[in-house]
């Protein structure tokens, strides 16, 4: 089993070949572009473990940007008792879907 942990946008994600990664919106890339993650923190390949200090040298993860979209709406309610007042707000966060094509060592 081959998987890696990559760091992007201040977060770490576990990725495997062929899977789809949902991450914060990557503004610099358009759908169809190739994206390369060179900040690989950890790699596991057939029982062999590589841990970076802080990153694994020579390792990179290559993916393809599928789409930019918005996530489901998160609703918040602020209610003030005895004031006959409440405020409802909603927020939809942008994300980028990336198909992981290969993990290179």
UniProtKB/Swiss-Prot annotation:
<comment type="subunit">
    <text>Part of the 50S ribosomal subunit. Contacts protein L20.</text>
</comment>
<dbReference type="InterPro" id="IPR028909">
    <property type="entry name" value="bL21-like"/>
</dbReference>
<comment type="function">
    <text>This protein binds to 23S rRNA in the presence of protein L20.</text>
</comment>
<dbReference type="InterPro" id="IPR018258">
    <property type="entry name" value="Ribosomal_bL21_CS"/>
</dbReference>
<keyword id="KW-0687">Ribonucleoprotein</keyword>
<keyword id="KW-0699">rRNA-binding</keyword>
<dbReference type="GO" id="GO:0006412">
    <property type="term" value="P:translation"/>
</dbReference>
<comment type="similarity">
    <text>Belongs to the bacterial ribosomal protein bL21 family.</text>
</comment>
<keyword id="KW-0694">RNA-binding</keyword>
<dbReference type="InterPro" id="IPR001787">
    <property type="entry name" value="Ribosomal_bL21"/>
</dbReference>
<dbReference type="GO" id="GO:0005737">
    <property type="term" value="C:cytoplasm"/>
</dbReference>
<protein>
    <recommendedName>
        <fullName>Large ribosomal subunit protein bL21</fullName>
    </recommendedName>
</protein>
<dbReference type="Pfam" id="PF00829">
    <property type="entry name" value="Ribosomal_L21p"/>
</dbReference>
<dbReference type="InterPro" id="IPR036164">
    <property type="entry name" value="bL21-like_sf"/>
</dbReference>
<dbReference type="GO" id="GO:0003735">
    <property type="term" value="F:structural constituent of ribosome"/>
</dbReference>
<dbReference type="GO" id="GO:0019843">
    <property type="term" value="F:rRNA binding"/>
</dbReference>
<dbReference type="GO" id="GO:1990904">
    <property type="term" value="C:ribonucleoprotein complex"/>
</dbReference>
<dbReference type="GO" id="GO:0005840">
    <property type="term" value="C:ribosome"/>
</dbReference>
<keyword id="KW-0689">Ribosomal protein</keyword>
């Amino acid at each position: 089993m081959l998987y890696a942990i990559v760091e992007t946008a201040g977060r770490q994600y576990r990725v495997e070949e062929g899977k789809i990664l949902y991450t914060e919106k990557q503004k610099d890339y358009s759908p169809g572009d190739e994206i390369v993650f060179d900040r690989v923190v950890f790699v596991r390949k057939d029982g062999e473990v590589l841990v970076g200090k802080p990153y694994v040298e020579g390792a990179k993860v290559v993916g393809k940007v599928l789409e930019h979209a918005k996530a489901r709406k998160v609703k918040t309610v602020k209610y003030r008792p005895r004031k006959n007042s409440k405020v409802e707000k909603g927020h939809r966060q942008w994300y980028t879907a990336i198909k992981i094509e290969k993990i290179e060592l």
